[in-house]
Amino acid sequence: NSVSALDHDLSRHDGVDRYFVIQQGNGPLNSGTGLFVATTLTNGNYYYAVTTVVNGTEEVTLVPGANTLQIPVAETVSAPQPVFQQTRAVGSKTIEIYTNFISSKYAVGMPLMNKAGFIANDFILFRNNATSGKHPLRIRFHGGGGDFFLNSTSVQGDELNINPEHFLPGGKNAYWWGANENFNILDSDSNESSPINGVNYDFSQQQISRIINWAITNLPVDTNRIYLEGSSMGSIGAYFYALRYP
């Protein structure tokens, strides 16, 4: 759709529209650019097509070279990685902003986690001048009324700090868990009542796991000193994550 490339987290914080960077070193996508993210589940060659839905009816006519590929894309399964967006100054300190993209198609032969197709959330990394050695890592879950910029450079000693976000594109938050497969995460107002059936998927917690695994691989982190911190609603996020992924 017309806002699929919109970085909802950064736009909400800045109060103006910001768009995703999908390849490090490139600029953000242009306004109105369509974006769809799919994670390869099996090695192979893939063709993709784009269809449109008008007044509830999908136009499925395929025109090679126009709305469908003529040459397949060779894809290989690998662990999804966050995409660097930008650096910013918070006071006199530098933070880095990344985006985690999660495909709703998580397993071959299984239904989508959500009809939205993909879920994207940002997180902030404050390196605290750590370049080598082994440092503690703090994952900070913000409370209600705040966002992922809250206390992003507040650290103790030589620890690194990561502040994740969990808002859904429609404006609701995922309560650091996720959502039901039938919940419309793109348009909160369309959810007149809570879903009474379907599977509840923990894609927000999956994002936290990906962040931690990425940090262990790419940052000077002491794996014996990874801490979760939360205030108010963020306490729920830290507590629930520790219970599910001890």
Regions found by a protein language model. Name each.
Residues 48-49:
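Hydrophobic beta-strand segments within extracellular beta-sandwich modules
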Residues 53-84:
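Extracellular fibronectin type III
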Residues 1-44, 56, 227:
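Recognizes extended acidic, P/S/T-rich segments that occur
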Residues 189-220:
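Alpha/beta-hydrolase active-site loop
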